[in-house]
Amino acid sequence: MEQQVKDDIQRVFQLQKKQQKALRASTAEQRREKLQRFLDSVIAHEEEIIEAIRKDVRKPYHEVKKAEIEGTKKAIRDNMNNLEQWMAPKEVGSSLSPDANGILMYEPKGVTLILGPWNYPFMLTMAPLAASLAAGNSAIVKLSDFTMNTSNIAAKVIRDAFDEKEVAIFEGEVEVATELLDQPFDHIFFTGSTNVGKIVMTAAAKHLASVTLELGGKSPTIIDSEYDLMDAAKKIAVGKFVNAGQTCIAPDYLFIKKDVQDRFAGILQTVVNAGFMEDDHTPDRSKFTQIVNDRNFNRVKDLFDDAIERGAEVVFGGVFDASDRTISPTVLKNVTPDMKIMQEEIFASILPMMNYEDIDEVIDYVNDRDKPLALYVFSKNQDLIDNVLQHTTSGNAAINDVVVHFSDVNLPFGGVNTSGIGSYHGVYGFKEFSHEKGVFIQAAE
């Protein structure tokens, strides 16, 4: 990395540090004006953003439009529309005296760093940025070096909307991220893998910076044999195979009773063929996404090959096209825990099925492993649902659906332990980027 880039990073960090007194006093109107500039810039560059993302990873136009563009605009508007309510001090009373009172004040953390991922490179970087700005912070942003076209247009969006003392963006490879992590940020927000999350947390510890880590994990899906299999298949097909399975909360593997396994797989194949395929073997390029790079393609192929060697069977799919970096939607059965595919997050369009007889088997299996980012249950049996929810831990859970909880701003979104630290969306994002200050007020004599 050039010395000039290092110097620029340090210069911009110090520039933003000097703005903190003014930012702490910023009003809802001032913050809303920044967010409006942000929104206007996203709208102005909308088609360029879509084109850049599709250059980095071939995604269907409608997927990019919905997830990356509409998702970003929704996040910005949600922050704009709720600023006064979120910023207002909250009275909590006092446990010491009827003449005293306690209030909670929300103040900006300061200079924040936002490190984005490659799977949804625009929205998963810009939505946290909106929360940081709503909380009154300044920010430095870096997107993944796997999506350089998206990074280039994101830089244009940010520079058209903000002075660098408000928001700055740096582009480049891992050396740039390393230099950024050397700065004493007040808060770091990272979305990506657990392994890199550990690196980020180690860097933050040097300065005792608070962190939000949006990571991943193996999110289990459980189907009760009494549930409507067509409904489950439609929802799982979208949650698993949109973006070729490269979604942190995609169903990673499936627990299903053996007596309905083949029937479910047949229904799922029909749904998948209608939604993603040209024929039984070839994904429709206009509807299906590539794997991001050769390294990840080869990693997933290794997981698949190991599973087959150990006795797993392909129910449908299993077609790997290295020249196009596509893996056809694939379902495996006769999967066992010792297979590599059950030991790391798949992050691709392969769904392993495992059988169970009693729900306690599933609960024990989940609890013996790292806590997942999400857990899904398809059932009409409230006792079964309650049993799973009460006896497992996951970042989030959804009942009779998958993935959609991400879009519900009334819920916090985040992981637990290896699947993440902290949460955001809606008011939870505002609080994540704020210092909640308790103030004790004693009545004057």
Curated annotation (Swiss-Prot):
GO cellular component: cytoplasm
Enzyme nomenclature, EC number: 1.2.1.3
Reactions this protein catalyses: an aldehyde + NAD(+) + H2O = a carboxylate + NADH + 2 H(+)
Reported phenotype of the disruption mutant: No effect on vanillin degradation.
GO terms of molecular function: aldehyde dehydrogenase (NAD+) activity
PANTHER family, A to Z: ALDEHYDE DEHYDROGENASE (PTHR43570), ALDEHYDE DEHYDROGENASE ALDX-RELATED (PTHR43570:SF20)
Organism from which the protein derives: Bacillus subtilis (strain 168)
Record gene name: aldX
Domain of life: Bacteria
A Pfam cross-reference name: Aldedh
Biological processes, Gene Ontology terms: aldehyde metabolic process
Primary enzyme class: oxidoreductase
Annotated family: Belongs to the aldehyde dehydrogenase family.
UniProt-recorded name of the protein: Putative aldehyde dehydrogenase AldX
Active site: 214, 248
Keywords, ordered alphabetically: NAD, Oxidoreductase
Top-level taxonomy: Bacteria, Bacillati, Bacillota, Bacilli, Bacillales
InterPro entries to which the protein is assigned, alphabetical: Ald_DH/histidinol_DH, Ald_DH_C, Ald_DH_CS_CYS, Ald_DH_CS_GLU, Ald_DH_N, Aldehyde_DH_dom, Aldehyde_DH_NAD(P)
